């Protein structure tokens, strides 16, 4: 089954994160994988049985974040990235362009 990566740069369960959790729990054609902005949010997704990773989204260390995302994409054979805010969209676009990945953003 194809995998979809959800990028959530925050570390708390608020509006967009709740919506992402609902989307992930109800996905039928894709297996969700989530990258969160911290352990707290990552643990919530793991409790729901959703594969989840955590990292720090920082403009100072953006290349570290991009390498982390690239490794997750390659490790899990991700085909689609769903970004849930502006920061996530920028990171998704940059990881695709920087590493020339064949993914849909």
Regions found by a protein language model. Give the residues of each.
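Short His-centered aromatic/hydrophobic patch
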Residues: 83-91
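Glycine-rich phosphate-binding loop signature in dinucleotide/nucleotide-binding domains
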Residues: 72-79
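Alpha-helical elements of Rossmann-like donor-binding domains used by nucleotide-donor carbohydrate transfer enzymes
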Residues: 22, 64-72, 91
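N-terminal strand-loop element at the rim of the active site
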Residues: 6-64
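Active-site proximal beta-strand in glycosyltransferases
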Residues: 4, 99-105
């Amino acid at each position: 089954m194809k995998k979809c990566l959800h990028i959530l740069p925050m570390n708390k369960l608020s509006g967009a994160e709740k919506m992402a959790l609902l989307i992930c729990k109800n996905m039928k054609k894709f297996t969700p994988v989530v990258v969160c902005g911290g352990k707290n949010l990552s643990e919530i997704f793991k409790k729901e049985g959703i594969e989840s990773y955590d990292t720090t989204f920082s403009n100072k260390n953006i290349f570290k974040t991009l390498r982390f995302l690239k490794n997750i994409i390659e490790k899990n054979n991700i085909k689609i990235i769903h970004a849930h805010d502006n920061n996530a969209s920028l990171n998704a676009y940059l990881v695709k362009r920087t590493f020339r990945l064949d993914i849909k953003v």
